[in-house]
């Protein structure tokens, strides 16, 4: 199906696709304009392998309008499982899970009629999004299973690695009552948002078995259904919904926003449920009719086609409204077209409080794709047409600080290549000078980071450059490099982002792509987090985050000028974030050298907020005037007295 043929299909602008439940009746609606007939098959269970599995009958849907087939069944069909059977004019048939399914049985093979009110945890009606000002925002990325799977996490065994692992608020290491873990730890770290790697239903983990495997989840199956392997009961579809909401509510009670990692750039299979409902419509193709694979791991969704765009917007709104999600991170955002991303931003903005919902993504692709109809990819080159409240991950900041992620031994500013100071200077002001050919209009568009789930952890990267092989040793040189790296991006303008455990030297022992596990490699090591040397690193992160929150001009969130850069010798960097309040002036210095370095100070009396090892909002140490000595491999922040 080419672009013209796709655009000739009827567009449905309703908001009622899917199974719409009331105790008196359920209405099924499916957009399938090329089908000749559609039947809904009803089942007692999500799979035929479960006790009491049996077929409850089949019912024909009727053609309604604009490509939609519809059926209203009287009676209470709550928790009934269903599947669509489609017949096409050329004789082909297909079985498909409802693309608008709200929940499903084990492994997502059948959708389930859901009573959303009955699938609400206690107190859900009172759940509110935390209000977090732009300058105080920071993101901590974690996989649901990684968060609490550690046997030492203090989380009850039945909740470990599950949505419910986020709910207990008082967990400690082995229950010792002293060393906080999981949510109890997060409450005091100082980050504002938790970004969850994919929590929608994905393909490659067998939900029916406790040992069904591990995956990061970038293999989407049912976009509006929570992943069943994170539920304590994957066989009853209402459980995953209730427990996912309970997780969000627990994070909100702790004052934390929830960002959802979404994968609307591709489907895992070429015969996805979407493709089965309207063959040839949903995915991009080359002129030879082969599906494009710009993600490198699936079949690209054609976001520029009208009903694909609608589907993505509808899905985002569903998660925002039904699960109170506070932000969305788009995997391979450059595989979406810019108009679709702007439509998402506009739709979120129209929600109550929606302008505070974060929206950002990866401004790159994993291969070649084939945009149609003049669509532009949502990459850095499209910043002139993208909303300035759609952010993007800045790989230039990342690589300048620690070295190129695709070359394990390549060094950056903090670990042996201080000449990258030129790029670090641009990072400070969020690259708004167009130095690399892209022009952010606001600092808040730039996600400043040095590690994420992809590639080596920060600790492992520093170890690789330094040719260390003992990833568990609290190497003093690596700790200093880690602190400087964090000190840089946490004093850059933009939105700071970190991988969970970066703040305690998280290691995967050199595994740069642990997407299939094992869990032992990926899970957070809460014992390591409380080893004294790594706990001190965490304390440094906590202090730097506090400095950032209290010195709003460092963040430069929206409408802020770029910092005033000081002229210093060699590869030293110093700058002053502009402040209208003379009582709220700080100066920041980076020293990548392995020796002490003297610097001249701006006029005034200054005291330290950080000396490169300790950090916090209370000034400490002597008063400095005229000049001071910077410690080796360090970040120094001074406040004007």
PLM features: residue spans?
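The feature marks proteins involved in alpha-glucan
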Residues: 1-23, 27, 55, 63-168
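Glycan-recognition and catalytic regions of carbohydrate-active enzymes
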Residues: 11-15, 494-511, 521-523, 527-586
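Carbohydrate-binding surface patches
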Residues: 20-36, 563-602
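Conserved, mostly hydrophobic/aromatic
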Residues: 30, 84, 142, 196, ...
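C-terminal beta-strand-rich structural cap/linker in extracellular carbohydrate-active enzymes
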Residues: 32, 79-82, 621-641
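C-terminal accessory region downstream of the catalytic core in glycan-modifying enzymes
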Residues: 43, 474, 478, 524, ...
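Conserved alpha/beta catalytic core and glycan-binding cleft of carbohydrate-active enzymes
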Residues: 114, 345-346, 350-351, 355-505, ...
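Substrate-binding/active-site clefts of carbohydrate-active enzymes
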Residues: 145-323, 332-352, 358, 369
């Amino acid at each position: 199906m080419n672009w013209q043929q796709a655009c000739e299909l009827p567009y449905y602008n309703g908001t009622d696709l899917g199974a719409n439940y009331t105790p008196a009746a359920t209405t099924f609606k499916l957009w399938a304009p090329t089908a000749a007939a559609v039947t809904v098959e009803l089942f007692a269970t999500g799979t035929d392998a479960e006790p009491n599995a049996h077929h409850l009958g089949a019912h024909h849907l009727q053609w309604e309008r604009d490509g939609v087939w519809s059926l209203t069944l009287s009676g209470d069909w709550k928790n009934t499982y269903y599947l669509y059977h489609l017949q096409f004019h050329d004789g082909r048939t297909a079985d498909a899970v409802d693309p608008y399914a709200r929940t499903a049985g084990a492994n997502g093979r059948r959708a389930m009629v859901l009573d959303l009110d009955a699938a609400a945890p206690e107190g859900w009606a009172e759940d509110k999004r935390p209000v977090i000002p732009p300058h105080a925002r920071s993101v901590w990325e974690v996989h649901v299973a990684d968060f609490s799977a550690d046997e030492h996490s203090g989380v009850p065994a039945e909740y470990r690695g599950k949505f419910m692992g986020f709910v207990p608020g008082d967990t400690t290491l082995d229950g010792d009552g002293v060393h906080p873990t999981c949510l109890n730890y997060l409450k005091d770290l100082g980050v504002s948002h938790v970004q969850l790697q994919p929590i929608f239903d994905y393909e490659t983990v067998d939900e029916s078995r406790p040992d069904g495997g591990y995956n990061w989840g970038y293999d989407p199956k049912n976009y509006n259904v929570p992943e069943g392997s994170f539920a304590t009961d994957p066989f009853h579809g209402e459980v995953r919904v209730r427990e996912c909401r309970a997780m969000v509510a627990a994070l909100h009670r702790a004052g934390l926003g929830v960002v959802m990692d979404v994968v609307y750039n591709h489907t895992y299979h070429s015969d996805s449920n979407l493709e089965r409902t309207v063959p040839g419509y949903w995915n991009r193709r080359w002129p030879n009719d082969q599906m494009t694979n710009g993600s490198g791991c699936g079949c690209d969704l054609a976001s520029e086609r009208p009903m694909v765009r609608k589907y993505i917007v509808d899905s985002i709104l569903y998660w925002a409204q039904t699960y109170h999600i506070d932000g969305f991170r788009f995997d391979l955002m450059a595989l979406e077209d810019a108009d679709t991303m702007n439509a998402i931003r506009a739709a979120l903005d129209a929600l109550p409080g929606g302008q505070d919902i974060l929206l950002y993504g990866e401004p790159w692709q994993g291969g070649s794709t084939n945009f149609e109809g003049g669509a532009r990819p949502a990459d850095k080159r499209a910043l002139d047409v993208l909303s300035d409240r759609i952010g993007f991950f800045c790989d230039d900041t990342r690589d300048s600080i620690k070295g190129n992620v695709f070359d394990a031994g390549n060094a950056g500013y903090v670990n042996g290549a201080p000449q990258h100071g030129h790029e670090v200077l641009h990072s400070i002001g969020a690259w708004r000078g167009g130095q690399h050919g892209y022009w952010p209009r606001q600092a808040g568009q730039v996600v400043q980071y040095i590690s994420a789930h992809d590639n080596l952890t920060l600790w492992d990267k520093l170890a690789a450059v330094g040719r260390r092989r003992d990833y568990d040793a609290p190497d003093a040189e690596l700790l200093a490099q880690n602190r400087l790296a964090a000190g840089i991006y946490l004093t850059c303008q933009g939105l700071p982002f970190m991988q969970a455990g970066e703040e305690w030297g998280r290691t995967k022992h050199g595994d740069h792509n642990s997407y299939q596990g094992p869990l032992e490699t990926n899970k957070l090591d809460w014992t390591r987090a409380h080893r004294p040397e790594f706990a001190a690193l965490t304390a440094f992160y906590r202090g730097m985050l506090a400095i950032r929150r209290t010195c709003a001009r460092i963040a430069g969130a929206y409408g802020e000028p770029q910092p005033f850069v000081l002229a210093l010798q060699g590869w030293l960097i110093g700058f002053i974030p502009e402040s209208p309040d003379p009582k709220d002036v700080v100066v920041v210095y980076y020293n990548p050298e392995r020796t002490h370095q003297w610097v001249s100070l701006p006029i005034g009396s200054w005291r330290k907020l950080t000396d490169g090892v300790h950090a916090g909002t209370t000034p400490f140490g002597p008063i400095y005037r005229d000049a001071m000595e910077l410690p080796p491999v360090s970040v120094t922040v001074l406040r004007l007295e």
